[in-house]
Design a protein with these regions (language model features):
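Structured mid-to-C-terminal alpha-helical surface segments
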Residues: 1-35, 48-56, 61-62, 66-215
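Short N-terminal binding/cap micro-motifs at the start of the first secondary-structure element
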Residues: 45
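Glycine-rich beta-strand-to-loop/alpha-helix junction loops that act as flexible
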Residues: 37-42
Length: 215
């Protein structure tokens, strides 16, 4: 049985960030069911990842989201320090000395009801993209920025795939043309610093894992 996240995070600042993420997810799930979590936090909290993620990526297609979110956040003691709507929408939420970034995208997505693991080990049900859809997003993310973390997330998500036919073609094309990670975007040492449990795989081992999964 896995230990609670609070027992294994390496730094106090990480724990405070993770706790704030939990509070924000509580706010989101209380104000709307027209949402779907995605990105690294979805992989970490819903699909048993072991990579610390510092922000929240979420699809939101609810009306009056801004007003509802600001009001609900204030009600639980969270300070919305920035809410930018021009270009790429993002929100900054702060509590005490900890601040996180939320990137809500106004797009309706099919989502699964899944348990989200909180810092203390308890779980709440939320709506999240399927592992197959997350893999397709992560393939695009890796091709765009070539960060170790995206490749790692793919290997984690493959353990939860229920419909292999949805991703096999994309994965075959991906590994056939894959380029090595860009150390200027995320160095291997930076990648190692955010993996808090288990072996930190090399680029070669992660590609090997994906190829083996397809056999």
């Amino acid at each position: 049985m896995d230990l609670p996240i609070s027992n294994v995070l390496k730094r106090g600042s990480e724990l405070e960030t993770a706790q704030l993420e939990d509070e924000v997810m509580g706010v989101l799930t209380n104000i709307t069911d027209k949402m779907a979590l995605h990105g690294g936090t979805a992989v970490w909290r819903c699909y048993n990842g072991k990579r610390f993620s510092t922000d929240i990526d979420v699809y939101i297609w609810a009306e009056d989201f801004k007003d509802k979110f600001i009001h609900a956040a204030a009600g639980v003691g969270l300070d919305v320090t920035k809410f930018r709507e021009k270009g790429v929408t993002f929100i900054h939420v702060k509590k005490n000395n900890t601040e996180i970034k939320i990137e809500p995208r106004n797009a309706e997505k099919y989502a699964l009801l899944m348990p989200y693991e909180r810092v203390d080990g308890s779980k709440i049900n939320i709506l999240v993209l399927s592992p197959e859809d997350l893999i397709l997003e992560k393939i695009d993310a890796y091709n765009d920025r070539r960060a170790y973390k995206d490749l790692y997330d793919i290997t984690i998500l493959l353990n939860s795939v229920k419909q292999p036919c949805k991703v096999k073609g994309a994965l075959q094309e991906f590994v056939k043309n894959i380029q090595t990670p860009d150390e200027n975007i995320q160095s291997y040492s930076e990648f190692k610093a955010v993996i808090y449990a288990g072996i930190v795989p090399t680029y070669q081992k992660m590609v090997e894992f994906i190829k083996r999964w397809q056999m």
